[in-house]
Amino acid sequence: MTNDMTKGAITPLLIRFTIPLVLGNLFQLTYNAADSIIVGKFVGEEALAAVGTSNPLMTLAILFINGMCLGAGILVSTAFGAGDTRLVERQVSTTAIAGTVFSLAFSALCVILATPLLQLMQVPADILPIAVNYLRIVFAGLIFTFFYNFLAATMRALGDSKSALYFLMISSVLNIGGDLFFVEVLNWGSSGCALSTVISEALCCVLCVLYIRWKVPILQLGRRWLVFDGSLLRKTVSYGWASAMQQATVQLGKIAVQAIVNTMGVSTMAAFTAASRIDDFAYTPQQNIGHAMTTLMAQNRGAGKHDRVKQGFLCGMRIEGVYGVLIAVVCFGGAPFIMKLFVTDPEVIHLGVRFLRTVSLFYLMPAFTNGIQGFFRSVGDLKVTLVSSTINMLFRAAAAAVFVLMWKLEIEALPYSYVVGWVVMLAYELPLLVRYLRSHEDEL
């Protein structure tokens, strides 16, 4: 099933496309929390620590996989909007072949080097064997991670975000069920958790392929898929590399801020951890709206409907603005209740409320930065998104260091450091946006 976003009222199209993306990400966040609870409750803190310490390496691999999938998705959206089904087939085929080779090579490398990589990360010796086993099992199934993300990204690029949501929900339910079976029933520990992840993603890959054969004729498997286009691969890599580096930059920025938070005491650390999870729930839909804008504008750009590209951008920014105001009201007014869902300590709740009420006052800023990034992704200028994200995180980390380490400010210093990053990010993006719109005024 595909969704031609070059026709119809734009605002309803964006909303209908965004809702499954939001639900999918919220479902993923909820699943991640459940996964940690199962390991921590039924295995113990050592297993939980082993799983946690393996996450940076897993995140690195997934960042590059997602980057390639996002890059390919933008190109697929553009080709689909132009009605060039042959180009869609070549793009999908080329990405599938290249992704398979990369996944298998990276998987083999990480399985072989799991022990020295974890030792390099200073993993304690008492949990090293647990972490090695967990990491090797997960990386052995990296090919399924690639195909699962690739097929879901391709369906979204064709305008079908609902199917991707359904498969994510199926994968998450299978994963949680597998965790309970392998960890609680069979007592396989963190290795059982890793095996559950691989099996659930493998089953979802099979379901995705069956669905595509049944519902998406443009992507039906056949000999024509065995086409490799070097020029398309280079273009995909250029798009994907920028996307992967952008996401990596965001992760590094979060790590830097966390390192500063770790100097502020246990109560502040706990409050920041809980409040950051809430902030993630609030922030994720803003990203999803931006990605929906990318798909809609890329399809219309490919179709040559430049008036709809501009309309899509303006409608998307209005949706971002409305959501930014609504979520700010919810987080500011409901901060005490929301914090009590995560923690019971009065001091931690008080600190978390101060964080949430401060950061929520500025939620319009990331709403607009995500909308602008969605625009630049749709026109293929991913360097802007990479540079702006890098600037944001550099200034955020630097501001946090100044506010906390030099000026000795309390927890409000952290959301204020976010604001510094967003302000500088907008100061970089807005002139480029105005320049692009003026230089392409005849088209838009």
Question: Where in this protein do the model-derived segments appear?
Answer:
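Short alpha-helical transmembrane segments in multi-pass integral membrane proteins
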Residues: 1-18, 76-141, 185-241, 297-362, ...
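Helix-terminus/linker motif at the lipid-water interface of multi-pass membrane proteins
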Residues: 26, 30-49, 118-125, 181-188, ...
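Small-residue-rich hydrophobic transmembrane alpha-helices
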Residues: 48-108, 145-164, 271-335, 366-380, ...
